[in-house]
């Protein structure tokens, strides 16, 4: 594909629920700003190579590649009837079955994209929290806000148990993003 795929909304939330890395992830500062991606301070050599950068890759093939990768991380396949992605323009929404495109018609604020594989980015949890208002109930979103500002995480996808972990964001971080 010519541009990276950016996971957003519920797909990003699912990703963040299974991929709690112990090391910081590589951050890209803007969705379509080639300079910000080229000047990454952290090397991307250790990122998984999924084949999303192949010339002439069909979108339907990309859906399968991304879905397989997410399943390999532990996301149940039945949660992936569609993959939420972020696009810049409304005309980019015409995609094959499997992608659900959400228009974000401005550059993504610096630091709010995380590169998880070559050609695959995910919005960070601050941005995902704001997007969650489109599909979570108010109590669910409130719980999610507590989780990302607290020192624990509820593992929604497997055990349903709370896990202690370092604080990821502060309330001020969320307010600054909004």
Language-model regions, residue ranges each:
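Short gly/ser-rich loop at a beta-strand->alpha-helix junction or flexible surface loop bordering the NTP-binding
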Residues: 1-178
């Amino acid at each position: 594909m010519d541009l990276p795929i950016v996971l957003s909304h519920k797909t990003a939330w699912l990703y963040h629920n299974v991929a709690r890395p112990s090391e910081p992830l590589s951050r890209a500062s803007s969705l379509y700003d080639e300079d910000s991606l080229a000047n990454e301070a952290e090397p991307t050599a250790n990122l998984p190579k999924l084949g999303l950068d192949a010339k002439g890759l069909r979108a339907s093939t990309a859906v399968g590649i991304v879905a397989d990768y997410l399943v390999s991380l532990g996301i149940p396949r039945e949660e992936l009837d569609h993959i939420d992605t972020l696009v810049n323009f409304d005309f980019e929404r015409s995609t094959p079955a499997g992608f659900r495109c959400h228009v974000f018609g401005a550059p993504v604020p610096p630091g709010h994209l995380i590169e998880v594989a070559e050609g695959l980015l995910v919005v960070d949890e601050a941005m995902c929290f704001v997007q969650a208002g489109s599909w979570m109930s108010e109590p669910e979103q409130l719980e999610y806000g507590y989780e990302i500002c607290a020192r624990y995480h509820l593992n929604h996808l497997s055990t349903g148990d709370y896990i202690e972990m370092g604080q990821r964001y502060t309330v001020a971080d969320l307010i600054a993003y909004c």
